[in-house]
Amino acid sequence: MTDQNEARLVKRAKQGDMHAFEELIIQHEKIVYNVALRMMNHSEDAKDISQEVFLKAYRNIGNFDERSQFSTWIYRITANTC
């Protein structure tokens, strides 16, 4: 995904567009799961963490600073959740 496309999706998600947020999830679900798996070393825990991460992201998307990369933000949420 290009940075420009990601920025458009984030902007739409911040405005309440669920389809845009769903696309962000699809684009980042593998990396979130893999980071959680590396940190937790257990696949079921990594799945649970992934769900929690995207729930936190959804609840806090309004606070996301669009000058930052969404991928960096979601990675940080993942690391903090683990």
State the predicted function of each range.
Residues 32, 39, 57, 61, ...:
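Hydrophobic recognition helices of helix-based DNA-binding modules
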